[in-house]
Structure formats: structure tokens, C-alpha cells
Amino acid sequence: MLTLKTLRDDPQHVIEKLAVKNFDARAIVEKVLELDTNRRALQTESDAIVAKQNQLTKQIGGLMKDGKKAEAEEVKKEVAELKAKSSELLAKADENNKELEAQLVLLPNMPCDLVIPGKGAEDNQVVKMGGPEVNLPEHALPHWELAKKYDIIDFDLGVKLTGAGFPVYKGKGAKLQRALINFFLDINTAAGYKEVEPPIMVNAASGFGTGQLPDKEAQMYYVGLDDFYLIPTAEVPVTNIFRDVILGNNDFPQKMTAYTPCFRREAGSYGRDVRGLNRLHQFDKVEIVRIEKPENSYAALDEMVAHVEGIVNKLGLKYRILRLCGGDLSFTSAITYDFELWSAAQGRWLEISSVSNFETYQANRLHLRYRDAEGKMQLCHTLNGSSLALPRVVAALLEDNQKEDKIVIPEVLRPYTGFDCID
């Protein structure tokens, strides 16, 4: 979340930057500043009472030493009154601070200066396109029909077992999933990312730390009996590894990668966007996470974008990179680059990765800090990206590599699959 210092220093700047996200922050900012003023006034009053208590307590000791018990008893009454008032002030301060926190979490992260205003996806900026042109056979099929033709993904069986959005991968389809996961992890670890295998359920503190709670609670699966949430992305548990951590000045960068199943309710999804693998409730994804000093985070972001682009190029797929406009930027992100693959069979672009810099927004929630060269405590910057999300990668691989009688596996994946085609 945004720091109080940021709001105090230039509230108008905060309001203007959040307007780029189409978020009207004025009322919340004004309320936060009012509550912050109350907080400081209550703290000043409380400190004065504590100082007076300490003074009177010393006075009582002196009176007792001089045998002036009656006077000491009168001072004790005064101390008791101060204690009662102190308790009352603490209760007021606690209530005020809870309301202050509740208001602060309503404010999204401010977009960085590279982010332009815009209503939504239609206003995102295409910053790069690459990959080979796709040449499909005459009777090309979308991936859901290819999956049925070659018996590699069973959507109907998933409906029987669970419901829509929970496909069953079979035979070479299952092996392709496993191959992609291992391929992505190998590339990530070769680039210096440490592999971790985190839990796929997290507590509310973890969900709050990375900003999924309360903002995206409606999109998360909740396990009520145990008060856990199924993760929508490995970003949540991996970034929370650093919750309440103080790093040293020389502990950077922190680079981690993880494969996890991911779970998203995706309430309200309908139409062609949900056909086949286009939008699922359970899917596999490999994630990269970095913790950086503020002065290095944008260079790290560029490295992450180049890293993801390198993976896509190795797969030989047509892609484009978008810089999201303010209206399409997530609640927690300061800047995001999306990667999309071209599905010639569907005639549309499929998102496969988002790479984001959250600056200090998540770190402030996580209490993730470091001591700089002068020993001062500073907030870290957090970044993450999909490297990659599997469903739409699989969709594009199947569609763009189809021939009349088979699907050709990209050469880089063959050591992982053990086969060169699906037929």
C-alpha cells in the first residue's frame, strides 16, 4: 500500500497519478490525512500523559521517603486518573488506526510515469512484435478441436470430475504439460533464479501482503474450514517468503522461480474467451519473482521482459509485447508489460505473461525492508512475471504447429517430451 509519507508529502500528486488508473482518490486521501492528523494528535496527548505519569511516580517515591504518606496518596490518585485517561486515549488511537489502515488499503498503487491514461485493453500500447508468421493448413482447427482429434485434452471429462474450466490432460498432452514446466524452470534457473516449491494454499496475511486481499477476494477460492485461500499465482507464496524480512544492503538481487497449479474463479467470464484453454479455473504456471533496491528495479524489469521474450522466441511463436495503460493496470502494479501469442486458428491474441514492477507497494504491506549502506531502513521493490502461464502457450503451440495429419513439437521441447509430433 502507499506510505503515509507519500500522501503527506504531496496528496495532490497522489490524486492525479491515481486518476491515470481511472480511480478517484480524493475522498479517501482526504480521509487518510484527517485520520493521520488525529493519530498524531492522540499520540502527542498520550506521550504527554505518560511523561506526567513518570514525573508523578518519581514524586510519590520522594514523598514516601520523606514520610509524607497522605500527600503521596493524593498523588497516587492523580496517577490513577492519568492511567484511566491513558487507557481511554489508547482505545481511541486503536480505533483511529484501524480506520486509517482500512482507508489506506482502498488506495491502489500509483502508476509510474511510463504509463499512459486509458479506459482499458483497447488503449494498451504495443511496444514490440516478433516471431515468425503462422502458415496454417487449409482446414486448420482451433486447439479444442485438435485436443479432441488427437485425444490429448479432455474438457468433457473435466466437467464430469469437477466442472467447466478444469481440463484433464492425457497421453502426449500430459507429457507436453510436464515438458513445458521443466523447460521453463530450466531456463529460469539457468538465469540465476532459485527454484522453490511453495504451498498452493495461503493464509489471509499472505493474500493481503501481495494485494490479492481484499481487492481480488471474489476471484479466489476460499477453503472455509481452515481459513486458507487457493493461490491464483505463485507470486503470492513466493513473495511472502520475504514478509517481515529485513535484508542487508548486499543481499540483492533476490531472484526466485516456482511452478504451481493456480486457481481462479474468473466470475462472470463467458463467450469465446472461455473456449478450450483460453480461460480456466485451474491451470499450471511458472513464475519469476525479484526483490530489488529501488534504484535497480526498473533495470531488473527490463531484464525480466527480455528473459520472457527469450523463452517465447525459443518456442518459435509469433508474439507481441504490450505496455498496459492506466485503465488496464492492476490494483497493485506501477507498470506492467503483457506478452500475447497470436492464435491464427482463432484469429486473436492470447495473453501468456504479465511482467510487473510494484515498486514499494507490496513491500509496505509485507514489511519487507533492507538496511542501506548508511544503516537506514528502506522499503524494497518487488517484481514478478509469468515465465510462462501454460494454457494459452499450449493453445498456440497446438494451433500454430498443426499440419494436416499431426502437430509438430518445437525442437527445443523434444528433449523434454521424448517425441517430435502428436499424431
Q: Which role fits each region the language model picked out?
A:
Residues 26, 129-423:
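TRNA-recognition modules of translation machinery and tRNA-sensing kinases, especially anticodon-binding
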